């Protein structure tokens, strides 16, 4: 099944348990409680996106939120893609769709944290930043020594923006060709 046959949609509270199961299958992602996943799918549905296959199964999910002190910023918390859908561009498709929806609500910046050894996430976000026409900066947000007692890699903050609409960016690229 290709990522084009997957339907992207706003999550709902019926997705919470399935999200918990999806994240558990997506090592090395940290699992949260089912309750946390229910909140991500209900209270934070405007800053999340779900991907389901033709059988209605959850095969991808991105959770995020707008930090209260920075309402013009979408912070992407977690990106999960089922193993059967990896390598088909689904994560990028979900991320760009989520950013487009958030931008319509005033979001101008995109943030996430990525550990230094997570090359796949680094590549995903760098591709997204390029598609969005957004420069980015990085800094260690949570350090292995100070915040994780040596038990977790550093979490490096990536901050991109100001964002250009995905559609506007594609139009700019076509005009310059």
Positions of PLM-derived features:
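Conserved active-site alpha-helix within GNAT-family acetyltransferase domains
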Residues: 92, 116-138
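Acetyl-CoA-dependent GNAT
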Residues: 21-72, 77, 82
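Conserved acetyl-CoA-binding loop-helix of GNAT-fold acetyltransferases
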Residues: 81, 87-100, 123
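A short, internal acetyl-CoA/4′-phosphopantetheine-binding micro-motif in the GNAT/acyltransferase core
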Residues: 78-86, 114-115
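Conserved GNAT acetyl-CoA-binding A-motif
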Residues: 102-116
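C-terminal "cap" of GNAT-fold acetyltransferases
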Residues: 132-177
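A short beta-loop-alpha structural element at the N-terminal edge
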Residues: 6-19
């Amino acid at each position: 099944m290709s990522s084009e046959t997957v339907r992207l949609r706003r999550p709902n509270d019926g997705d919470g348990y399935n999200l918990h199961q999806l994240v558990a299958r997506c090592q090395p992602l940290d699992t949260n409680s089912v309750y946390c996943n229910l909140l991500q799918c209900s209270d934070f549905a405007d800053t999340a996106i779900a991907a389901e296959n033709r059988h209605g199964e959850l095969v991808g999910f991105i959770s995020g939120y707008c930090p209260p002190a920075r309402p013009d910023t979408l912070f992407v918390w977690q990106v999960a893609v089922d193993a059967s859908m990896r390598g088909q561009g689904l994560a990028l498709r979900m991320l760009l769709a989520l950013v487009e929806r958030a931008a319509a609500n005033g979001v101008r910046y995109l943030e996430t944290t990525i550990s230094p050894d997570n090359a796949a996430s680094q590549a995903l976000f760098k591709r997204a930043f390029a598609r969005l026409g957004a420069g980015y900066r990085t800094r260690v947000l949570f350090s292995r020594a100070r915040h994780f007692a040596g038990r977790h890699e550093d979490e490096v903050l990536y901050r991109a923006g100001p964002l250009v609409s995905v559609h506007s960016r594609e139009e700019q690229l076509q005009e310059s060709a």
